[in-house]
Amino acid sequence: MKLPIKFAFASIFLFLAAGCATPRIVRNIVEPAIPSYHQDINGVPMRRVAVLPIDFDQQTESTPNELDLVFHAELTKTSAFEVIPISREELHAHFGIPQLSSVEIIPSDLLVRLVQDYGVDGVLFTDVTHYFPYRPIAIGVRCKLVDAHTGVQRWVFDHLFDSGAPQVAIAAKQFAVDQESEQSPIATDGADILDSPTQFGKYVAHETYRSLLGI
């Protein structure tokens, strides 16, 4: 059966248009890992915060202290509030414990003592919930910021940073590139961060505490 002339021309036009059209390019854009968090915006601003030692369960002496330094440094860079580090020795001297998890019951006099001795508005608990220092490096972090006067949680955070995930690896390398560009004019792709638990820990701390802004 012959098609009417107008339909034949229409079919030819569609065929030619389809052949000349530029194919649509689909790009998979990987976004940096931005963990979810919660904050209570009704509380008064935090100006001085006591930062407790990181709660770390693995049997090692050096790693917790190294993580304390790394996390304190990145927290200070946020300028979210004045950071008052509480050492493991101080915590043990006052309360008989070297560290305290964010999910443990807070000793009844801890907040009162910290307010009296250090004049703080809040207390920050940080736990390393997972630590795998070999490639692919993975570090899990759980945090809680508590109002030192009321005991109310002002901010909570719980996230696993796994460098085996492409979006995490990309974000970590970009962090390393940004850090290197501030210190050295030598170009780098930032890939070394994926082999260093200390450097990757800096990225983890940066991303964790970045969400504190606005508290």
Task: Report the location of each language-model feature.
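N-terminal segment of the mature soluble domain
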Residues: 46-52, 58-123, 202, 207-215
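Residues that line or immediately flank small-molecule/substrate-binding pockets and catalytic motifs
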Residues: 127-130, 161
